[in-house]
Structures are given as structure tokens and as C-alpha cells.
Regions:
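Radical SAM [4Fe-4S] cluster-binding motif and immediate context
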Residues: 62-213, 225, 286
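Structural recognition of alpha->loop->beta junctions
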Residues: 1, 172-178, 242-250
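Flexible glycine/acidic-rich beta-alpha junction loops that bind and position SAM and/or redox cofactors
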Residues: 86, 133-134, 184, 190-195, ...
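Flexible loop residues that form catalytic
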Residues: 1, 29, 127, 185, ...
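Acidic, low-complexity intrinsically disordered segments
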Residues: 1-8, 12-108, 112-116
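Short, electropositive alpha-helical surface patch
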Residues: 137-144, 233-247
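Hydrophobic/aromatic residues located in beta-strands of well-ordered beta-sheets
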Residues: 40-41, 122, 153, 180, ...
């Protein structure tokens, strides 16, 4: 403690280690701090887990963008829901199956703030934005009715569950008001079953085509290379089928085997070899 006495106001150098500096004598303060860790719910300590923490009410979380100066000309990342009702084996969101929503009145107030600020792009990070149809429709209706002619909104959706009234509303949007990111990942039926994905590929194609006919929304379709039961030939078929839909952008990613996911538990079963450190990307298959 002698070496750090009188330096509590100085910030430690940034590295991978968490620093705690006690002001003046740290003997008692340090002991109290360590003892208190065990009383904090939701921590994983060397001695084991502390008591579980209740899921956070999203409406109680603070709004982070009151001061927009640090975010000038930057993409704004915004969240109105957490959790996902689907069980995609590569995704950590599948662990939290209970979908929680931020109160819609709060969401509308915050969206209006972004619109008033003429933010260039607001990117929703909700895992499946339209899994709650009422919530999605209220937000889409709001940005349609309050469009400022400048702001673009990005949504990650499941296209095959879009309803007719949702498609009709999207077709009325100003060109550039919204863009949709649609995860296809694979069109191989065996792969889709293996990754626990619920998706009607034929219906997805028709809905993407219906949105495309409106010529007003940028559609960004995703594929993942390296999924179970997907080889070069079958992946090529997935690529050709998605390319034929004519999305404005086709994004190819490589499978990431995230710790805690179903895919991580069964990677050896599928012969998947991957990086043990971030980004945990697949690097090959066992021969």
C-alpha cells in the first residue's frame, strides 16, 4: 500500500487486469471489498457462484445518449429487447429464452430524441427484432409517421415470420428509412435441423422478393460457413440460392464456437476445430 499511497486519483494504465486502488490504508478496506464480493448476486468467483441475479427490467436501464457530442457522425447502437425465443445452437441468445421488452412509451421517446438530433443511423441490436409482432409494428409505425428524411434504422429480423401487414407497412417507407439484416445461415435442410433453426426457406424467399419489389429497403442477407453437415458443395448451393434472391448485400461469416453455446458442447461430435481464444472461429474439421 505504500507504493500507491496518495495516488488514488490517478487512473491505472489500461491492460487486461482489473485494478482496485484503496485510498490511503487498504488493510481493512481491501478485506471488506473481498468479503463483499460474495454478497453480490450474479458473480462467478474462485470459490463458486454467488446467488443468482434476477433478470434486469430493460425499462429501468439508463438512456446512454443524452449527450450526443461524443457520438457525432457515428452509428448509434440501440436495444429494445433482450433474449430470443429461438434455439440456434451457435448463438448465446438462445440461452435466455425469455424475451424482455423495453417499455414502448420509453422507446418512442428515445427514438424521437434520435430523430430530433438527425442521427444518421440507429442500429437496433435486438437479436430478433420482430419476434414480438406488436412491439415491432409499433416501432415501425412510429418511425414511418415521424420520419425526418435523414435517419436510417437498421433491424435484424427473421424474414419468414413477417406478416402481410408488416410487409405492407415496410413497402410504404421512404427509401433509406430502414434496412433489414436477415440471417439465412444455410439452406441445407440437414444443417438447419442440426443447428436447431426454425426457418421456412421457401417462405423467406417469397417475403424477401416482396420487400425487394418495393425498391425502398436495403436487404442484407447472412450466411455462415462451417456449420454442421455443410461441405463445400452444399455451402455452394446455399450461396447460389441466396444470391439468386438478389439482396442488396450478401454477407458471409465463419462459424464462431462460443463458450456456453450448444455448438460448443457438441463441437467435438461434429469434428469442428476452432480457435480457443477470441474470436473462437472455426479453423477446420477433424479428418
Amino acid at each position: 500500500e505504500a507504493e500507491t499511497a496518495g495516488q488514488s486519483e490517478q487512473q491505472p494504465e489500461s491492460d487486461s487486469t482489473e485494478h482496485q486502488v484503496a485510498d490511503r490504508r487498504g488493510t481493512v478496506a481491501g478485506k471488506s471489498m473481498v468479503e463483499r464480493f460474495g454478497q453480490i448476486p450474479g458473480l462467478c468467483l474462485a470459490s463458486g457462484y454467488t446467488a443468482p441475479r434476477d433478470l434486469t427490467d430493460l425499462t429501468t436501464l439508463p438512456f446512454l445518449y443524452e449527450d450526443m457530442e461524443p457520438f457525432t457522425n457515428r452509428i448509434i447502437y440501440y436495444e429494445t429487447s433482450r433474449g430470443c425465443p429461438y434455439r440456434c445452437s451457435y448463438c448465446l441468445s438462445s440461452i435466455d429464452k425469455k424475451v424482455r421488452l423495453r417499455d414502448i412509451s420509453v422507446v418512442k421517446r428515445e427514438l424521437q430524441f434520435f430523430l430530433d438530433q438527425n442521427v444518421k443511423q440507429v442500429k437496433f441490436i435486438d437479436r430478433t427484432f420482430n419476434c414480438d409482432h406488436k412491439h415491432a409494428m409499433e416501432i415501425w409505425q412510429y418511425i414511418y409517421e415521424h420520419d425526418n428524411g435523414v435517419t436510417n434504422f437498421h433491424f435484424e429480423i427473421s424474414a419468414d415470420i413477417l406478416r402481410e401487414e408488416e410487409i405492407a407497412l415496410l413497402n410504404r417507407f421512404r427509401p433509406g428509412l430502414a434496412q433489414l439484416e436477415i440471417g439465412v445461415q444455410s439452406t441445407n435442410p440437414e444443417t438447419i435441423r442440426a443447428i436447431h433453426r426454425v426457418m421456412d426457406v421457401d417462405k423467406l424467399e417469397k417475403i424477401v422478393a416482396a420487400i425487394h419489389r418495393g425498391q425502398n429497403i436495403h436487404q442484407h442477407l447472412d450466411l455462415i460457413a462451417g456449420l454442421p453437415f455443410e461441405d463445400y458443395e452444399s455451402f455452394g448451393r446455399s450461396f447460389d440460392r441466396v444470391y439468386a434472391i438478389q439482396p442488396e448485400q450478401l454477407q458471409l461469416g465463419f462459424l464462431k464456437v462460443l463458450k456456453g453455446s450448444y455448438m460448443h458442447e457438441h463441437a467435438q461430435e461434429y469434428g469442428i476445430r476452432y480457435l480457443e481464444q477470441p474470436p473462437y472461429e472455426e479453423i477446420g474439421r477433424a479428418s
